[in-house]
Amino acid sequence: MQIRPYRPQQDYRAVLNAQCDLYKINFPRFVCTPAFLADQAQRLRAAAKRPFENGIFVLEDGLDFAGYVWVAIRMDLQGTYGSVDQVYLQDSYRRRGLGKLLMGAAHDFVTKQGIKVARLYVTAGNQDAVRLYEREGYAVTRLEMEKPLT
């Protein structure tokens, strides 16, 4: 297994195709449409053009794509932070401790820029991801609540 920086010409299709799976894991009623993929493609191309603001790292198993992590540098009223936006592993690579490797790549990207805080959002029902993030030292700082209005 090897983690390396994203190479647009080599990795674009694999990372883009993983978007549908990633969203289905987190949003069970999600339907992957051409419009969704077009939007994600635009985001991915834009991120690749700003390598100091976006770290995208690919996990390879030999020549096979196994997953990736996407972290962005952001700023709000509390200061600058690393936002771990996406962590994805193909199904056959899950529950093998590889998420920790991807998180390490994200954290390294952030700390090399002198930033001392990383944040992320996780869907409450994605308990595998919640456990990974808790093991990595993340703690709940805010709760987002929702009420369907009929």
What residues fall within each predicted segment?
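A short beta-loop-alpha structural element at the N-terminal edge
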Residues: 1-17, 28
